[in-house]
Amino acid sequence: MTEEEKTKSEAEEIEQNNKEEEQEKSVEELLEEKEQEIQQYKDKLQRIHADFENFKKRSIKEKQEFVKFANEGLILKVLEAYEDLERALEVKEDKNLREGVELIYKKLTKILEDEGVEPIETKNQKFDPYKHEALMTEDNDDYENNEIIQDLQKGYTLNSKVIRYSKVKVCKK
């Protein structure tokens, strides 16, 4: 083998090695790109999974809230009868009638309490527009400004949510 052939052969070998290195680099680059792509898909899947879990929790909470207040309309109707019984109890003439009405009143009171219904307190309270509806105002020296003078119609909450505002007379100075 001549010197020229030897040099030519070495040059071909170097060129072949360069091609192999380029192919290795392109395979490595391709592999790295695919690994990055896989990581992006994993991240996306993780976000979607977290979003779905949050959606499930929110749906459960909304369902619980719906169930909690589903009886609101019925309770508002029962409250009217409940208050009629309250007024009937104020009549003290017929003892047997009164005892029967008291029994019904106590049962209704227990039912409403068990369902989460509570009357809104107005005695010695300041007017709160989130709980009370002012139907009348009066300048009265016996009360402070914005203090409730009289409860004209009871208000109620269902599980701490106002379902009927107390209708009140308020002191305004």
UniProtKB/Swiss-Prot annotation:
Pfam families: GrpE. It comes from Methanosphaera stadtmanae (strain ATCC 43021 / DSM 3091 / JCM 11832 / MCB-3). The keyword 4Fe-4S does not apply. Residues 1-30 are annotated as: Disordered. NCBIfam families: PRK14140.1. The keyword Protease does not apply. This is Protein GrpE. Participates actively in the response to hyperosmotic and heat shock by preventing the aggregation of stress-denatured proteins, in association with DnaK and GrpE. It is the nucleotide exchange factor for DnaK and may function as a thermosensor. Unfolded proteins bind initially to DnaJ; upon interaction with the DnaJ-bound protein, DnaK hydrolyzes its bound ATP, resulting in the formation of a stable complex. GrpE releases ADP from DnaK; ATP binding to DnaK triggers the release of the substrate protein, thus completing the reaction cycle.
